[in-house]
């Protein structure tokens, strides 16, 4: 096992232009490219001179090829008790009309359009309508506060903003339109038009000189054809989650993105035309862009738009119900979703109630998946669980298990091997390559493959400084890890997840992996805190599985013993506390930085992406009970 993968991977690195030119044959082009790769100025432009349209590849192509009556999109909203289905022809027709609205309001190729929407079909329709015109969409996660929305509007300078009147949470309605109005007031840049989708749960007040009603406008608008764009023209700008200060807008091109999306579906996710693809994420994040919207539709799959949660809508069976009801073939979600399910249903009783025969595989990404969670999902679903590692900046998997190219043996804790085009290396702090098993900084030797960021919007200096300057000739991922003797990648965490305990560099991610093995632990986080004697020491936060009523002190002692047993006394892991939940962003990333800020008594910079600020307050009380911050009495 491994010959096909090894040969393919080697070809992609030795002759990237020939490799990706072959892959690009799966995409429809109006005109082929003049050059496969232009790597001048530190920017990597793929398929230079090529002319195509992303929306055409996602919708019209399937209609023209006789698949217009196949289901393209299923909308399932437990929070509104709504279900809808669209064929490829129906979706194409709606997208064409909405593109007509944009065109009638003056939106042309190269204009930016900010999209501020909940998880409803209209969010995807808005994105595809922009792509149809060659306009550059910038999706902002629905429910972001006005200040965060304003910073993105100010940076992208959109001609139009597309929004909905509201978003629906488990037990509340978030009124989007007042947030949007406040955000625009804060901006020096003013959009000429706001297109508003009115939802029955909340009808927004409209400003007649600026706002137009989407539904009414769509009824009277004729559809427009796709506009040919250059492969190197931007498809979208996506601002990285948790941004503080000025936002960082990742630019994705049209051509390279389309080629990589097609390649990944054909070779990694083993998804064919007609398959049902369920990505439980949000279009506000990169996973949603790539694997709710573009990749499934480009490959002729049926994509599911889910407006709900893994739990509480109404219970931990949500994913399993959808898999049975729609005969889902591939499930893709973040590890945190499965941890939430595991916490409420540790024995998997809900899973047993549903038929999962249609499901072939489960993919997880967005954060490191601990071995215990991976094994739990695998054991109860009896399906292969595939971890994959990537970033907003790359747009698709740096490391994964290419199921249809050649499935590799799964090693728990590893997202398997680097994907073609990603020349992954482990470097020390001086930029020297390290050997097998040596822990260091994960970097990608240039050039980057198609779909990776073209740069940062309107800030080339920030792009170079943040990704290219530290190790010339390499792209800095910002993650640490190692590659074992078999070529398997292990991601230990962000560079700031390495702590220095009495001169020993230790990974908090490795400690989390060990703690997660404890039978009572649902999920955990480890941070480094300042210590007068050792410089830094680790502090653990533990969330227990539902129904665990054992004494917390005994559980903490057991966890401490586990870390000592696996790493040794050198870890100095002695401080831990049980909490009801971990603070997270809405995309499921644990806010370890905020935990450390509270433990060290430094200024707390809470991101706008936080899911529940009350969880942070509860953790602060737990930290105080441990006697931290140590300098509290001095302030």
Q: Predicted regions: what is each one?
A:
Residues 192, 196, 533, 565-590, ...:
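AMP-binding/adenylate-forming catalytic domain of the ANL superfamily
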